[in-house]
């Protein structure tokens, strides 16, 4: 393997949503160097951080019917049974919910937790309070998606936070997704909620680190059947 290919294998590409930001930071950095070199070095650090924030690494997703994988990198902040927001259309009974908080240092590309078809997408304007607070799921700006699978419906909500002010979705209603497929992105810190079918037992705990497309949140079929893996 050449040195160039080796470097490419170690450094993930930048997501296209990050191009304007990284380019803008780089331009400002050049201006800062022209004004005063110490400012330019500060700009260089910020440009590198921006490129790091918008990284788009490949992930190896376990592929088996019934597995629910994490839609986001971050920390599992809540595992509770709670009534889902009405826009999901999942009823008024409490359902298992796994919440994953993404800091500004996590990769913010979001991935489908299951293989299924997008039944519903609803954008809800709102506030920008701390995404770690429980009420953020109802008060904050959010983009809600319902995935239909053979084992029931899965609700996925992208929630904006104090710093995150832009939710990006790459998908549309009726579109099929495979587990681990990229479906969106949230800029600069936020939260992802996953609502599981009634009676599902989450396989993660609060405080655990989750990796998008890889960490298994739940098994809708149960058991320990074999699985294959897909890298994307």
From Swiss-Prot:
Lineage, top-rank taxon, reads Bacteria
- Give its E.C. classification number: 4.1.1.65
Which co-factors does it depend on? pyruvate
Catalytic residues in the record: 190 (schiff-base intermediate with substrate)
Per UniProt, subcellular location reads as:
Cell membrane
A single GO CC term, please?
plasma membrane
Q: Where is this site: Cleavage (non-hydrolytic)?
A: 189-190
Please provide the record's keywords in A-Z order: Cell membrane, Decarboxylase, Lipid biosynthesis, Lipid metabolism, Lyase, Membrane, Phospholipid biosynthesis, Phospholipid metabolism, Pyruvate, Zymogen
Tell me what this protein is called.
Phosphatidylserine decarboxylase proenzyme
């Amino acid at each position: 393997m050449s040195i160039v290919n080796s470097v490419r294998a170690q450094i993930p590409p930048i997501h296209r949503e990050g191009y304007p930001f990284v380019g803008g930071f780089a331009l400002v950095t050049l201006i800062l160097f022209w004004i005063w070199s110490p400012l330019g070095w500060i700009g260089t650090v910020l440009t590198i951080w921006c490129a790091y924030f918008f990284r788009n690494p490949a992930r190896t997703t376990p592929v088996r019917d019934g597995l629910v994988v994490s839609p986001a990198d971050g920390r599992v902040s809540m595992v509770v049974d709670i009534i889902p927001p009405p826009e999901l259309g999942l009823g008024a009974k409490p359902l298992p919910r796994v919440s994953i908080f993404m800091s500004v240092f996590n990769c913010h590309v979001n991935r489908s937790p299951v293989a299924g078809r997008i039944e519903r997408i609803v954008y809800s304007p709102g506030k920008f309070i701390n995404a770690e607070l429980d009420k953020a799921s109802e008060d904050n700006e959010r983009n809600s998606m319902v995935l239909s699978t053979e084992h029931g419906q899965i609700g996925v909500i992208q929630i904006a936070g104090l710093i995150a002010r832009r939710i990006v979705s790459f998908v549309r209603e009726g579109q099929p997704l495979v587990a681990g497929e990229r479906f969106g992105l949230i800029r600069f810190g936020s939260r992802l909620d996953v609502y599981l079918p009634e009676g599902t037992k989450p396989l993660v705990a609060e405080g655990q680190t989750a990796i998008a497309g890889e960490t298994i949140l739940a098994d809708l079929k149960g058991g320990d059947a074999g699985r294959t893996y897909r890298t994307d």
